[in-house]
Amino acid sequence: MDYPVQKSEHEWREELGNRYSVLREAATERPWSGELLDEMRSGLYSCGACGHELFKSGTKFDSGCGWPSFYESVNPEAVELLEDDSLGMVRTEVRCANCGSHLGHVFPDGYGTPTGLRYCMNSIALEFTPNATSTPQSPTDR
């Protein structure tokens, strides 16, 4: 797929630094290690490579898996879903539809969410921008 944001892998490597392996090589950060896992403020989550808007804080929930989880993207066109048969299992990879960077995986395992989906994202693949009037909230208030 051709993405609106096009850069050479050398350019990505220079720009992304320690984020490169996750965003461009589909690595996975260690569970419970991401800075955004416990982010409780209202705001917007964007692609850590290109800034494309991906998820609203109101769709974030605690799945207990060790990575930030969301039940839907800001719109269906914000992300690209691809079959991933690595590691001896079939999963659905989630990429940024604007630059093709790897974000994580989506699983249809429910958790009682409105969509029945769990977008399991790498914190290092996301940027968080709090709303101007944002204060910490409980997960049920988001």
What are these regions (language model features)?
Residues 3-142:
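A short Gly-Trp-Pro
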